[in-house]
């Protein structure tokens, strides 16, 4: 990234979205020269924005995160409509996580994984080590009790992890990251949803051509027709888009 480059932020419905130009700019900003940036990464799309508007606690969690990025094509298009001069690209959460892991492997950055089923987590660890030689300093599957949370926070802190990725779904992962950061603020936290499942092949992602056309949502809908109710809720965001209420 060029020296002194200022990355713009764009306000959509009260949420400040970072306007990353491309994946390289994200990586250079977070893992460039010097220590890994600390803070929380949250993927933003239309569905999450609408959820946050209906859930005060989730809204506060998201707004307190340092790095909100445009994960969905809906968010990118909304920003471009409101800010015609904006130069930003979609940064898919699954792609960002893989890119972070690859860069972490190259730099020897310590990583701690949280969430997922035990077998999926084990496969994720094995693949990360084999593919990018990632320095994994600890892990915990998603099956732990509320009483075990503080012990897990202590393990994460003791590991010295610089990156902590949490696959628990929203809003559980945002709550976990907030609470863990109070105990151990010296890391970059990233909520990754079902990314471990995709990475290990347990869940099939849309082909690249669908992704590049911004139609990943349609691919998922065709694969899982039960998602139709979730998609219909997005009509509210379409209303924001066309009525100038972004």
UniProtKB/Swiss-Prot annotation:
InterPro entries: UDP-ManNAcA_Trfase_WecG, WecG_TagA_CpsF. Keywords: Glycosyltransferase, Transferase. Pathway: Bacterial outer membrane biogenesis; enterobacterial common antigen biosynthesis. Pfam families: Glyco_tran_WecG. Its EC number is 2.4.1.180. GO terms for biological process: enterobacterial common antigen biosynthetic process. It catalyses: UDP-N-acetyl-alpha-D-mannosaminouronate + N-acetyl-alpha-D-glucosaminyl-di-trans,octa-cis-undecaprenyl diphosphate = beta-D-ManNAcA-(1->4)-alpha-D-GlcNAc-di-trans,octa-cis-undecaprenyl diphosphate + UDP + H(+). Belongs to the glycosyltransferase 26 family. HAMAP family: WecG_RffM (MF_01001). This is UDP-N-acetyl-D-mannosaminuronic acid transferase. The lineage of its organism: Bacteria, Pseudomonadati, Pseudomonadota, Gammaproteobacteria, Enterobacterales.
């Amino acid at each position: 990234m060029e020296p002194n480059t200022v990355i713009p932020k764009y306000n959509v419905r009260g949420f400040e979205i970072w306007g990353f130009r491309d994946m390289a700019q994200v990586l250079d900003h977070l893992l460039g020269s010097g220590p890994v940036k600390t803070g929380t990464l949250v993927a933003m799309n239309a569905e999450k924005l609408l959820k946050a508007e209906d859930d005060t606690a989730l809204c506060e969690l998201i707004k307190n995160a340092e790095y909100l990025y445009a994960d969905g094509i809906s968010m990118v298009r909304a920003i471009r409509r409101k800010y015609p001069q904006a130069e930003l690209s979609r940064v898919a959460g699954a792609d960002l996580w893989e890119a972070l892991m690859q860069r972490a492997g190259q730099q020897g950055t310590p990583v701690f994984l949280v969430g997922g089923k035990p077998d999926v987590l084990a496969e994720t660890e094995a693949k990360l080590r084999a593919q990018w030689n990632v320095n994994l300093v600890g892990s915990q599957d998603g099956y732990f009790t509320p009483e075990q949370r503080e012990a897990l926070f202590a393990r994460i802190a003791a590991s010295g992890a610089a990156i902590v990725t949490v696959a628990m779904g929203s809003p559980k992962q945002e709550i976990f990251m907030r609470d863990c950061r109070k105990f151990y603020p010296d890391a970059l936290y990233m909520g990754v949803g079902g990314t471990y499942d995709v990475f290990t092949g347990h869940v099939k992602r849309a082909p690249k051509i669908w992704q590049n056309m911004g139609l990943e949502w349609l691919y998922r809908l065709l694969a899982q027709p039960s998602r139709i109710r979730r998609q219909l809720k997005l009509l509210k965001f379409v209303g924001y888009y066309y009525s100038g209420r972004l």
